[in-house]
Curated annotation (Swiss-Prot):
Localization, UniProt: Cell membrane
Family under the similarity heading: Belongs to the potassium channel family. S (TC 1.A.1.2) subfamily. Kv9.1/KCNS1 sub-subfamily.
Source taxonomy: Eukaryota, Metazoa, Chordata, Craniata, Vertebrata
Compositional bias segments (type: Basic and acidic residues): 502-514
Entries under SUPFAM superfamilies matching the protein: POZ domain, Voltage-gated potassium channels
Motif (Selectivity filter): 424-429
Protein name: Delayed-rectifier potassium channel regulatory subunit KCNS1
Keywords recorded for this protein, A-Z: Cell membrane, Ion channel, Ion transport, Membrane, Potassium, Potassium channel, Potassium transport, Transmembrane, Transmembrane helix, Transport, Voltage-gated channel
Membrane side Extracellular: residue ranges: 240-270, 323-340, 399-411, 432-438
Gene designation per UniProt: KCNS1
InterPro entries assigned to the protein according to its UniProt record, in alphabetical order: BTB/POZ_dom, Ion_trans_dom, K_chnl_volt-dep_Kv, K_chnl_volt-dep_Kv5/Kv9, SKP1/BTB/POZ_sf, T1-type_BTB, VG_K_chnl, Volt_channel_dom_sf
Organism: Macaca mulatta
One of the GO biological process terms: action potential
Domain characteristics, as noted in the entry: The transmembrane segment S4 functions as a voltage-sensor and is characterized by a series of positively charged amino acids at every third position. Channel opening and closing is effected by a conformation change that affects the position and orientation of the voltage-sensor paddle formed by S3 and S4 within the membrane. A transmembrane electric field that is positive inside would push the positively charged S4 segment outwards, thereby opening the pore, while a field that is negative inside would pull the S4 segment inwards and close the pore.
The protein's assembly and partners: Heterotetramer with KCNB1. Heterotetramer with KCNB2. Does not form homomultimers.
Length: 529
């Protein structure tokens, strides 16, 4: 009986340690209950006051539960309060159960600033990250703009508002000339179309050879040949306009008429004509090849450089069609269709647009096109300023010079003088002679300098930006390893699930090897925060 009493008393005493509000080591009953879990709730996968061991981009730290509990809405705060391992894995990139370490593949520099946030409650802007990357990191870790310190909030908001207009500023910062991710994604989407096409890999390689001069040695040779043909075509067109060739063609036409033959058949020099046929054949080959190899026919006809290629060969074929309409392959016909001959001459004049084909091989011309595309507002402002200035000063000059016979007879006639003066060209064909007219001309010239200089500065800054950006893109392609570039292209073709699994295993092994390599240089225990 005594033994049972003692056992009953011992049982009651043990029960009282759990139920009664008796403090133990400064902690209440709730702490004691947490150490003795109930069979209904199960054993917790990690203690609530256990420090959190994290690895962010190779930077290992040990975070205290008390610091994380102050910010339960952040990612690390939710990770600390996770009720199960499955819930915790959804908040991190990887978890090492043996080392009880959470891995995050994020920017390590931002993580160091995040540690300062958990200590002080304020987040400071990092100059090494652009505002968009900084905002993405802050959103990932569960921080908002309210977490920014007062000393950095105004600077962050100002940089975020001015970042879309970074190309308006003459800045040499890397963020102003780095390739845009949208451009890279557009190229990848275009190349991905070859995956489902017939002979897609061969077509993709040929397309890149024709479009990217720095892709390979054949692409460089193709670019050199294309430039040579364009220059030869322009040179032939210029030589054809020389007086010596004009006189030679006129004499040949007279001799043909005397012999009873058509003068149109001998109008062109045979050498220049053969050179023209060769250039047209090459241009036609380029256009047809790019059209057949293009990943998207719709996008092909929307690209400005492709439209230039089409316009460069279109006059030749329109001339042939006009010759057929005139009833003769040489372009002659009856008197009733004589006016079509002048249309043929207009078509021949359109050959001058072939010089624009050099834009495909010239960084400066492509940068100029991009500048004009993004400067339509500034160009409109420039034209508006010129129109207002020309109208005002032309009226003043007409009033001052209308009594003199110097060419200022009407206001529309004065517009030519005002335009030439405001653009500071000054042909001198029409000049004022009165004192009032000279004062008006002086004001027109000075006003033109001020009016033209304002928008031109903005346009020049944009051109500098696009030129540096294009150079950076070309340097990235030129300095990149060819095999790495092939691997990048192969990635858009689509890979099997087994290949993806192998890639993930290789990445995991590489990351583990990196951690093992870094382990000896790190302290035995991560720093506690």
């Amino acid at each position: 009986m005594l033994m049972l009493l003692v056992r009953g008393t011992h049982y009651e005493s043990l029960r009282s340690k759990v139920v009664l509000p008796t403090p133990l080591g400064g902690r209440g009953t709730e702490a004691l209950v947490s150490e003795c879990p109930s069979p209904d709730t199960g054993i917790r996968w990690r203690q609530s006051d256990e420090a959190l061991r994290v690895n962010v981009g190779g930077v290992r730290r040990l975070l205290s539960a008390r610091a994380l509990a102050r910010f339960p809405g952040t990612r690390l705060g939710r990770l600390q309060a996770a009720a199960s391992e499955e819930q915790a894995r959804r908040l991190c990139d990887d978890y090492d159960a043996a080392a009880r370490e959470f891995y995050f593949d994020r920017h390590p520099g931002f993580f160091l600033g995040l540690l300062h946030f958990y200590r002080t409650g304020h987040l400071h802007v990092l100059d090494e990250l652009c505002v968009f990357a900084f905002g993405q990191e802050a959103d990932y870790w569960g921080l908002g703009e309210n977490a920014l310190a007062a000393c950095c909030r105004a600077r962050y908001l100002e940089r975020r508002l001015t970042q879309p207009r970074a190309w308006d500023e003459d800045s040499d910062t890397p963020s102003s000339v780095d390739p845009c991710p949208d451009e890279i994604s557009d190229v990848q989407r275009e190349l991905a179309r070859y995956g489902a096409a017939r002979c897609g890999r061969l077509r993709r390689r040929l397309w890149l050879t024709m479009e990217n001069p720095g892709y390979s040695l054949p692409s460089k040779l193709f670019s050199c040949v294309s430039i040579s043909v364009v220059l030869a075509s322009i040179a032939a067109m210029c030589i054809h306009s020389l007086p010596e060739y004009q006189a030679r063609e006129a004499a040949a036409a007279v001799a043909a008429v005397a012999a009873g033959r058509s003068p149109e058949g001998v109008r062109d020099d045979p050498v220049l004509r053969r050179l023209e046929y060769f250039c047209i054949a090459w241009f036609s080959f380029e256009v047809s090849s790019r059209l057949l190899l293009a990943p998207s026919t719709r996008n092909f006809f929307c690209h400005p450089l492709n439209l230039i290629d089409i316009v460069s060969v279109l006059p030749f074929y329109l001339t042939l069609l006009a010759g057929v309409a005139l009833g003769d392959q040489g372009g002659t016909g009856g008197k009733e269709l004589g006016h079509l001959g002048k249309v043929v001459q207009v078509f021949r004049l359109m050959r001058i647009f072939r010089v624009l084909k050099l834009a495909r091989h010239s960084t400066g011309l492509r940068s100029l096109g991009a500048t004009l595309k993004h400067s339509y507002r500034e160009v409109g402002i420039l034209l508006l300023y010129l129109a207002v200035g020309v109208s005002v000063f032309s009226g003043v000059a007409y009033t001052a010079e209308k009594e003199e016979d110097v060419g200022f007879n009407t206001i529309p006639a004065c517009w030519w003088w005002g335009t030439v003066s405001m653009t500071t060209v000054g042909y001198g064909d029409v000049v004022p002679v009165t004192v009032a007219g000279k004062l008006a001309a002086s004001g027109c010239i000075l006003g033109g300098i001020l009016v033209v200089a304002l928008p031109i500065t903005i346009i020049f800054n944009k051109f500098s930006h696009f030129y540096r950006r294009q150079k950076a893109l070309e340097a990235a392609v030129r300095n990149s390893n060819h095999q790495e570039f092939e691997d990048l292209l192969s990635s858009v073709d689509g890979v099997s699930e087994a290949s993806l699994e192998t890639s993930r295993e290789t990445s995991q092994e590489g990351r583990s090897a990196d951690l093992e390599t870094q382990a000896p240089s790190e302290p035995p225990h991560p720093q506690m925060y």
